[in-house]
């Protein structure tokens, strides 16, 4: 998913550096490397335990493989806990981060009141949630990959223009991972634990490996073997964290925008400052437009992940529950646009972390199943393309 990859990487990298210094990027790399193995298992198990819902649509995700992992009351309760947490973490608190970022970017570029932006985003999202997908979703789907390509090209040109600062940017990342104050003067008061904390937390937000969110998308893919989708999932994390994330990080560091420790600075504003240094005010406008499409697409995707779990929780009245959930999400989108950025991120971090617990318990219990799937996959004849 181009939108989720680019948006989460942009927001994740920028906020990690604001809160934990340049060294947080190093810990995002570390989390991505471990995350590749985790997400391979998640996607493979999501494929193995997928099912068909009441509408005849293929569905799956952690709630389903957790039930398969633990028979009896414990498995049922654990699956319900996960479904509740993801419904809150993504649809509500995660989407608050997205609307907050869109609002901050538009306020910085055009001076528009954040609440007005939040209301517009909420109305557009509400139409899609309640069935009016049509043109809005279609236009977004077509424009997001184009915007992603422009964003990547813009970041590459920006880094090349400031290539002389690249060695210093690398130094700041590696030194800052273990001594934030030595990497950049403004981060003297930042402890190594903060670099690790925000690097891992934003890495989780960025690639979602271990959270249990992406298995919902991987479950519906049509593949010959469950592990084929596991490989796709690994590639997604690689592109997300080791390519897109680095473009954002080096854009900020090579242009020297992270010169002072300011936790009130938003991710969007930091990225806008980097692009403005090379492209003038057009850079801020460009990032605002990119942020809208990337974050808006992520809002839609995360809502549907949450909705799948709401339907799981309310099996007897899924349609009614989904509509109520949609209305609540719309309200949270508006509220998120107006709240302080650190509060929004803290809520998102908390629930993202809580999601990991039941999901990892399910993965751990099914580790032998995952190994059997992998062993069987290795025996498959190589496909001739």
Placement of each model-derived feature along the sequence:
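Selective recognition of specific alpha-helical transmembrane segments in multi-pass small-molecule
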Residues: 34-42, 119-133, 144-164, 197, ...
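Helix-loop-helix module between adjacent transmembrane segments
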Residues: 31-56, 62-63, 67-129, 290-300, ...
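Extracellular loop-to-transmembrane helix junctions
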Residues: 18-56, 239-247, 349-362
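Extracellular/periplasmic helix-exit of transmembrane alpha-helices
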Residues: 41-49, 54, 156-172, 180, ...
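Transmembrane helix-loop junctions in multi-pass membrane proteins
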Residues: 9-16, 90-102, 125-139, 157-169, ...
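Flexible loop linkers connecting adjacent transmembrane helices
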Residues: 12-25, 37-74, 258-278, 307-317, ...
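Membrane-interface loop-to-helix entry segments
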Residues: 82, 99-106, 112-174, 310-311, ...
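Short, small-residue-biased leader/transition segments that mark boundaries at the very start
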Residues: 1-8
